[in-house]
Amino acid sequence: MIKTLMGSIRDYMKVTVATPLLVLGEVLCEMLIPFITANLIDAIKDGAAVAEMLPTAGFLVLIALTSLAFGAAAGVTCSHASCGFAKNLRHDLFYKIQTFSFANIDEFSSSSLVTRLTTDINNVQQAFMMIIRIAVRAPLVLIFAFTMAFIMGGSVAMVYLVIIPLLGFGLFFIIFKVRPIFSRVFHKYDALNESVEENVTGMRVVKSYVREDFEKEKFATAARDVQMDFTRAEKLLAFNNPMMNICVDGAFVVIIYLGSKLIITSQGTLFDVGQLSSTFTYGFQILMSLMQLSMIFVMVTMADESAHRIAEVLAAEPTIADPAEPVLEVADGSIDFDHVSFKYSKHAKRQALDDIDLHITSGETIGIIGGTGSAKSTLVNLIARLYDTTEGAVRVGGVDVRDYDLDALRHQVAMVLQKNVLFSGTIAENLRWGDPNATDEEVREAAHLACADEFVDGFPKGYDTWIEQGGSNVSGGQKQRLCIARALLRRPKILILDDSTSAVDTKTDAKIRAGLASYLPNTTKLIIAQRISSVQDADRIIVMEGGRIAQIGNHDELLKTSEIYRETFTSQNKMSAEGEGAVEADTEASATQAQTQEGGEAHE
């Protein structure tokens, strides 16, 4: 874990190494100050003239200023190193996530990844800052001050041999109890972030179902769980300072008593005031260093769980990667499923897809229908290699998708996913995800083919209209049409529409399909839909059931051979007819009412 995280220091290695060296200089200067002060006290006691003490006093001031300079420089380099380390670590973590396949992403929730990129990295940054400065300073002060205390104080300094083990035992006990609590806290942070993320992204649904009170209670519960665990940890940590203060005060009382008694009994021959002063000062430095060490242990304990969570992501190997010698060009849009089986997890009891054998020629239009959970989306996800097959092979352009360069493959397979996602930016910027170099005319053409221009032209700023995160300021149908336009700009060899017109009316759906046929005549098109009207003009239609291909054929063939298809078609036609009848009835009633009103007005 440490090796994994330390790889993020990189270009900040010099300031990272410089910080402990500057701290060493600071500590050495600090250790001289009590020694010089003791000599000055002895000189004053012996009645030395001011002129005789000036060189020693000047040297003391010089040492103090030098210590200050070393400390200030260490603070600057420490801050520079820790901020740079956190920046690199955040970049490494974010870039690692970009390499993840869907299978990798399934292992970590989005809220957990956000926590690792923010809270966890902040914790590690604070710990890193303390380690390269305070964790170096405290042991050095402890060693040097302990040595000088024995040199100056002799037997009086033996008090510290009793105090230090007591403090160490108490600190170990506290850390032992606190560590598992911090581990639970970060998992509960994930739940808290998940609650916030769901509420913010689904605010319209929350309000439409009047679920504000439920969401408030859910958030309060998650926040309360975090608070309770933090409170438990803080209660244990609260014993740290009183324990330190008791030991410090007790040590000082004993030192003053023993030192004063020794001075009086020996009349200053075995122990004098200067030695007592320096022993007292060194003792204060020893105990302060112990307090700093306790703070470090607490911070490191808190950061340890964060570091493990970050390292877990950094160490995760992408389940999908480019081959050693990848194919860089997709020949055509033909697709072959050669006895493909797939399951999302090796521990899953059943296959999501079972023995799929399917061959699609380049330029063919394929419709895919099936009930919920029939693995329609799973089937098309394998084409762009969002997942790898468990058994069998998927070929695009006659080449196994595992042999392609991922960028080359996915550039030729445009997908409009079931969950339509837009990003914060203008409409034009969102559409240019399909082709960053697309001209304004090409952007407008794609929008026209997707029937998006019907509403975009109505916005005051047109294609410069700002889209909020996730497309929260446009409707579901508008979002779908923008996502289709984005895919069209790519001009791919394979276009996959995963239930991408479910939120638009049938008339607009038909216009979009006509536009696709004229704009991309040689592109292989796979259209997943719930409405048979969206796929009935396809060259072939696949009926999925339970992860298998139940039937395949054109519209007329399936009406004869597939009971599922026939029942779905009949049901949808009946619903459509009833809807049209209701509309006609409403229209006639409105007309009759209008005539009655007109007649009444005329009579009056």
Go through the PLM ranges and name each one.
Residues 10, 16-73, 77, 150-155, ...:
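Transmembrane helix-loop-helix hairpins at lipid-water interfaces of multipass membrane proteins
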Residues 11, 99-103, 119-128, 132, ...:
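An intracellular "coupling" helix at the cytosolic face of ABC transporter transmembrane type-1 domains
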Residues 93, 97, 206, 310, ...:
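Helix-loop junctions and hydrophobic alpha-helical segments within the transmembrane domains
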Residues 21-22, 29-42, 63-110, 114, ...:
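Juxtamembrane helix-loop junctions of ABC transporter transmembrane domains
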Residues 14-16, 22, 63-82, 133-140, ...:
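Alpha-helical transmembrane segments of multi-pass membrane proteins
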Residues 2, 10, 21, 25, ...:
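Hydrophobic alpha-helical transmembrane segments of ABC transporter permease domains
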Residues 46-58, 148-162, 171, 232-309, ...:
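Helix-loop-helix
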Residues 328-604:
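ABC-type nucleotide-binding domain
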